[in-house]
């Protein structure tokens, strides 16, 4: 690898992206950093996506087409084809600022496994930035010896998207990191696994990604049983593959509770989950019941909150909804319960 000019492989999976993909590819074409290759995979599109990407002329663009396999398998295919020193994932409806890759590569010192930029929520229709995903305001480097970034994510609720992160290819290969096939919310698991195993991670304050928020076909807009099953698969995988196998059980336990909180939170606006899916949630939550210890870098009230969330998750789905949402003073009541639980456990 050339330290000052490493090759970056930008991986773009495409499925029925004809409305967006030309502008996305233009944003890659306009990158100020010259050492890039773009791997574009048509994942069985039924619209004109393949025609558009085939007609886009750029010697650095490598185009592949396959039967529909889903996002995880398509990204994994991109990883197999990537020849860069780094890989960068971009969705087929998102935009890269012209200096995105240059901003991510420039601070590389030779030791970072992952470099993370700031993500802007972007309206495709108005071409304006709406807001920003949670991020660190200043440039910050982590050796991550005690999984500090997982703790940071629990506190700050950092976005777990796979995009807008420069991953060192050697690191991904050494750790045999791939996306779990056949589930929704594969990014949640990918974020956990990559951050858990990374030794050196750099956050930079530069905006290096425009994340489209008004695509009605995004899975964040379409909530059904697969959505719930996806979260449950992530929780079970982390529990079985990491909590039961690695010594860092304390942080993993709290991270599982963090994911349970997200899963429970989705119940409020997505009440159309089937009874079978809710029963599966109850079964998974009861099976995944980690032990919580307090020698972790969280404030006591935060620890008690996640312990409370885990306790709540062991109840039936109707009780979970009632406890978490139905009372108009839910927020005050919830924090009162946490406070009382904290006081009780000090005695």
At which residue positions do the language-model features occur?
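N-proximal low-complexity "stem/linker" segments adjacent to membrane-targeting elements
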Residues: 1-29
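Acidic helix N-cap motif at the loop->helix transition within catalytic regions
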Residues: 19-22, 36, 47-55, 95, ...
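A conserved acidic beta->alpha catalytic loop
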Residues: 27, 34, 42-51, 69
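Glycine-rich, basic loop-to-helix element that forms the pyrophosphate-binding segment
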Residues: 66-82
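Donor-binding/catalytic cores of nucleotide-activated saccharide
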Residues: 71-72, 92-204, 209-226
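Short aromatic/hydrophobic "clamp" motif used to bind/position activated sugar donors
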Residues: 87
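Catalytic core of nucleotide-sugar-dependent glycosyltransferases
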Residues: 206-215, 221-250, 262-265, 269-292
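Membrane-interface aromatic/basic loop that binds lipid-linked glycans or pyrophosphate carriers
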Residues: 271-347
């Amino acid at each position: 690898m050339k330290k000052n000019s490493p090759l970056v492989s930008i991986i773009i999976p495409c499925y029925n992206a004809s409305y967006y993909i030309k502008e996305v590819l233009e944003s890659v074409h306009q990158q100020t950093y010259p050492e890039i290759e773009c791997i574009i995979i048509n994942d069985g599109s039924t619209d004109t996506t393949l025609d558009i990407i085939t007609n886009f002329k750029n010697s650095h663009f490598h185009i592949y087409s396959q039967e529909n396999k889903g996002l995880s398998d398509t990204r994994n295919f991109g990883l197999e084809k990537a020849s860069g020193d780094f890989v960068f994932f971009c969705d087929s409806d998102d935009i890269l600022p012209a200096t995105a890759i240059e901003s991510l590569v420039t601070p590389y010192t030779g030791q970072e496994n992952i470099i993370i930029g700031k993500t802007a929520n972007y309206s495709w229709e108005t071409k304006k930035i709406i807001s920003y995903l949670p991020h660190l305001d200043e440039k910050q480097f982590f050796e991550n010896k005690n999984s500090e970034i997982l703790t940071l994510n629990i506190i700050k609720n950092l976005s777990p998207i796979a995009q807008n992160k420069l991953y060192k290819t050697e690191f991904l290969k050494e750790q045999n990191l791939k996306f779990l096939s056949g589930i929704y919310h594969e990014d949640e698991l990918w974020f956990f696994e990559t951050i858990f195993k990374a030794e050196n991670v750099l956050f930079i304050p530069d905006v290096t990604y425009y994340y489209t928020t008004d695509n009605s076909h995004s899975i964040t807009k379409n909530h059904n049983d697969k959505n719930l099953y996806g979260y449950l698969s992530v929780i079970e995988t982390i529990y079985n593959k990491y909590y039961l196998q690695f010594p860092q059980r304390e942080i993993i336990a709290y991270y599982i509770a963090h994911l349970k909180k997200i899963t429970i939170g989705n119940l409020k606006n997505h009440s159309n989950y089937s009874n079978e899916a809710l029963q599966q949630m109850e079964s998974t939550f009861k099976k995944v019941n980690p032990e919580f210890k307090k020698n972790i870098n969280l404030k006591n009230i935060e620890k008690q909150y996640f312990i409370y969330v885990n306790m709540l998750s062991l109840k039936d789905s109707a009780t979970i909804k009632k406890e978490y949402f139905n009372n108009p003073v839910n927020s005050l009541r919830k924090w009162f319960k946490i406070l009382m639980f904290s006081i009780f456990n000090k005695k």
